[in-house]
């Protein structure tokens, strides 16, 4: 195999990876994760692209201390971020599978 053929193969692979990654990013924007804190008193819905779509606070919680509400909101959002990160890793691994990329390369996208 000559160097020119190797370069063409690399360019073809790069274009395929870029297309797969773009499709995966669109897919992530449409997928949602759901998290909660305080046994469901605070619920968060977030996309795979870390966009918070909905925050629900149980009305009974509004009568309590603001510090507790803030802590539960932070806990629910942090849980949603962890789930969205896992969804991202899973989706990107699928988008780049079969490409022969070295381990850890998916994180570059």
UniProtKB/Swiss-Prot annotation:
Keywords, ordered alphabetically: Cytoplasm, DNA-binding
MF terms (GO), sorted A to Z: DNA binding
InterPro entries the UniProt entry points to: YbaB-like_sf, YbaB/EbfC
One Pfam family cited in the UniProt record for this chain: YbaB_DNA_bd
Keyword Ribonucleoprotein: no
Cellular compartments per GO CC: bacterial nucleoid; cytosol
Localization: Cytoplasm, Nucleoid
Major place of residence: cytoplasm
Keyword Magnesium: no
Family (UniProt): Belongs to the YbaB/EbfC family.
Function text: Binds to DNA and alters its conformation. May be involved in regulation of gene expression, nucleoid organization and DNA protection.
Alphabetical list of NCBIfam families matching this protein: DNA_YbaB_EbfC
Quaternary structure and partners: Homodimer.
Protein's recorded name: Nucleoid-associated protein Pcryo_0799
The organism of origin for this protein: Psychrobacter cryohalolentis (strain ATCC BAA-1226 / DSM 17306 / VKM B-2378 / K5)
